[in-house]
Structure formats: structure tokens, C-alpha cells
């Protein structure tokens, strides 16, 4: 278990930073390339542990994939060309891999067994396995398919019209991917619109997808045609530096190539509402996944209320939004965020516990947290508990705290941002 010591940043964070590739888009580019016909080249791929797990699983199913840094070539097998894996498919720490891949495996006529690490073993799979079973897939797991390992015997599926109890891009994507080889039109309706990378990328690969309000539909029997994918920077990774630029005194940062998919930019809306000073310069208008350069500088923030439809657009950014709120004048209330409980950790509990250790005034609620600003943070020993987003949030907090902060289990950040600590060090000079 590796530790990292963070010293206070006295002269602010300054400079330009190119944000690494979007994790959600990198996963999908590899998966869709694997089931497409032809060769897909991916540029800007995120070579973090989670996305490498996706590559490894599809290689196990006979797909020819060559990865060189942030460039990946996938020679697709088509929807019917995947081979039965001889070994267990290991997704590591990646919830995206297991949930989306389950949709693909559900319609593939062979047997597979899928498992992950200790964190994956605690995450609920029934939200995906139940609708896939309704389509006709034969899936089992611990506690009737609630937890991994999962065994999947795929085959002929029937389309369903599914109303999801949660706004989850992973649930929606698994059902749509299963629907590619199902008989009929598959439809998924959500309580709020979740991130739409799957829909955008399926369209880029030649699949006709229909969107009507909170419902997404596709007809079975459509083929994917290989296409080249340019992955923009991950706004969830950018969020840590956006908040750092806003709350650490004497800072000015330019974040280059940040993905600006409107289903993901809740963090931008929240920072604007809190009073942050920043500019957004679009750089690839017309692309299926928009991107921009963002300049942000030290700002006076104020507390706000965050809840409702915006939550699915910033669910992964809530840990660092909570940190921003500790430096805002007044009270910030985060609600409707039950999904935080089923992430890599229960993020309501871990955010509250670890920020409290640093001197923040913050309390947990059933569906979020209440943060009382403005707090003076003081260095302490804290723990990521193996959660990459908690680890990065604590590192930014450490830059601001008085005295040194030691982060236990700091290597967890490599899941989504392998160069995070090096970038932070560079900007602090």
C-alpha cells in the first residue's frame, strides 16, 4: 500500500495541462471496435488500469488489439466473431467493463465467467443482470446474480422496453448492447438522462439510435462498421484541477482538450453557480464528442444547493465538489446522490470521514452531504480506501492544507489518471 506525502502549495498552481483521455469513451472505443467489422484506430486512449482491463478481456475473446501508449488499434471480429474465453474474464477494478461487457456477452452464444477485484465483488450487478435475464440471457452469480463472479451463457435474446429505476449509463449501455443482436426494438427509459457516450459512439459506428426524451431505442440486427475514434480529455479528471485552480490561492490553470459532452458537464455548471472565474474555448465544434480548453483562476466561491437532474451529470465529481464547498462562504447541500453509495467506496461516507480528518465541517445525509464553509484545512494522514477519485480529491486538499498531508493507498489514482501526481508536482513549481 503506497503512501504519498503532499506539502502545502504556497505559490499556487500555474501552467498548462493536457487532460488524459476520457475513461468512459476509451472503454467504449475498445469494446465497439472489437464487435465492429474492420480496423478501428483510437487516439487519445486512456492507458489507466481500468481501460487496460477492457483490452485484456477482449484479447481473451480472440480480438487482435495493439496498444502503444495512448494509441490503440483494434481489428474487429464483428458481432458474431468473438470466441469463447478459455480463462475467467478479469475486469480488475472496472465497473464499466463488467457492466457493459455483460450486455455483449449476453447475446453471444458461448459460456463465460466474469470477475473483478474486492471492490467489484461488493458492487450491485442485479441492476444489469435482471434486465438482461428479462431479454432471455442465462446469467448467475452470488446471491442470485447480485454479486460477482458472474457466469453468462449468452444466446438468442428478445428486445424489451425497460424502465430503469436509476439513471445509470452502465445499465442503459448494457441493455442497448444486448439489444444489438436481440429480436425487435430495445428501449430504455431512465428517471433522468444519464451520460450518452454509448449512443453517440454507436451512431459513429453506423448504428441507428433513436432518442425521445428520457427514452433511447435501437433495433436489433444492426452491424457496427469500424471507424477511427479521437478521445477527448476526461472532464472527470479535469474536475480535480478545475477545483484546484479555483480554491488554491495564486493559481491560474489552462486545461487543454477537456471533453464537454453536455451529459457530463455538471461540474462546469456548479463551479459557475458557486462563482468561479473561468473561460471555456471550444476547440472541435461538430465532433461527436465536443471538447474545449478551459482557463480557471483563484476565485471567491459561495455555497449552493446541488440536486435533481444535475446529479447524473456530475456524480463522479461530487468528492471534489465537496472539497470546493469547504472553501466556499456559506452552506453547500448535496442531495439526490444515493448512487454515491455504490461506487468504488461508499463515497458519502469516505468523503465525509476523510475531509473531517483534515478539519472540514461536513456531515453525511442519507442521499448526500452538507458542507459548512469556509474551513481552514490542516494536514493529517488520510486514506483513499482504493478509490481513485477519493485519492485525487485528498491530494488537492493536501495542497491547500496547513502542514503535510499523507495519503495512504495513493496508487489507486492510477485507475483513471496514471500521471496525476507528476502533473500536480509540475504545476506547483
Curated annotation (Swiss-Prot):
It is found in: Cytoplasm. One of its GO terms (molecular function) is 3-phosphoshikimate 1-carboxyvinyltransferase activity. Catalyzes the transfer of the enolpyruvyl moiety of phosphoenolpyruvate (PEP) to the 5-hydroxyl of shikimate-3-phosphate (S3P) to produce enolpyruvyl shikimate-3-phosphate and inorganic phosphate. Monomer. CDD domains: EPSP_synthase (cd01556). GO terms for cellular component: cytoplasm. Belongs to the EPSP synthase family. It comes from the Bacteria. This is 3-phosphoshikimate 1-carboxyvinyltransferase. Phosphoenolpyruvate binds at residues 23, 95, 123, 170, 347, 389. The lineage of its organism: Bacteria, Bacillati, Bacillota, Bacilli, Bacillales. It catalyses: 3-phosphoshikimate + phosphoenolpyruvate = 5-O-(1-carboxyvinyl)-3-phosphoshikimate + phosphate. Pathway: Metabolic intermediate biosynthesis; chorismate biosynthesis; chorismate from D-erythrose 4-phosphate and phosphoenolpyruvate: step 6/7.
